[in-house]
Amino acid sequence: MGEEYAIKCDRFTRKFGKLTAVDGIDLRIKKGELFGFLGPNGAGKTTTIKMLTTLLTPTEGEATVAGFDIKTDAALVRSKIGVVPQEFALFKELTAMENLWYIGELFGMKKDELERKSEELLKIVGLYLKKDILTESFSGGMKQRLSVAAGLLHTPEILFLDEPTTGLDPQSRIAIRELTQKLNATGITIVYTTHDMEEADKLCKRIAIMDYGSIKAEGTPHELKEKYGGGHRIELELGPHDEQLLEELKTVANANEVSQENGIVVIHVTSVGGGLIHTISSFLAKKKVKVKEMDITEPSLEEVFINVTSKQVRD
């Protein structure tokens, strides 16, 4: 059986003078995962990516990427990864196709292979019909999609996307997210950094929440919400009932709290698993209390972030 992990980090640290930008993180990212680093600007996400892509050397700790040590096998690491940085690394005086040809030549790709691969990637990112247009006229979203194509030219095993939707309009953001999911479905491991909670929730299979250089929590979006979100909220609009019902509901639902807000009964529970909704519905049916409407709200990643970092999200 081959190596299970695309990326492994142990005690991964980077200091700039007295400032510790990344503080001894331990991390495992499985092959084929779409893994997200979530956190505000200054959390250490980009510094972590720069170390994993060999642009920065860690002050302490070890890491392997695609099975190679980032310190001793940096060239081999670079041959296995694609990188799409925050800033567009494109030449505005070149066309979309010419940009890819130039970058492919830097990888040492042969002409026939480069032309074939460039056409294939431009079709994948939806820019084939724009291949002969100068990139200076491209929108931010088009430039980002072209940057993704450039990062895929040499068929990497792992693709790093650093804040790829920052500053883009809503349509372009959706296009980049859909492209990311499409690429991940082909088996490419994707490491995705963002400070957008909703984006991370919808896109990433697993997430590491970073702040001040440390990983504060890690897991699937569902796991993070269950563990750190503060519980679910069940709202019930009920028919006529006596005041004692709220206390009975608290016991039946094993609730943290049951209250009434503007005529709506609100049940706060840690989890809605284990047939809880059926239990509540059956109890109310036996009490002959009509349920006019029921709404279940799960905690958001923003609530998770606030709970694990004890503060509001920064820009």
What are these regions (language model features)?
Residues 78, 122, 225, 305-306:
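Conserved protein kinase catalytic domain
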Residues 272-315:
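C-terminal coupling/interaction segments
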Residues 4-217:
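ABC transporter nucleotide-binding domains
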Residues 177-270:
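ABC transporter nucleotide-binding domain
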Residues 1-4, 314-315:
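Short, Lys/Arg-enriched, disordered terminal segments
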Residues 14, 27, 236-238, 267-269, ...:
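Preference for bulky hydrophobic residues occupying beta-strand positions
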Residues 10-12, 258, 294:
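Generic beta-strand hydrophobic packing signal
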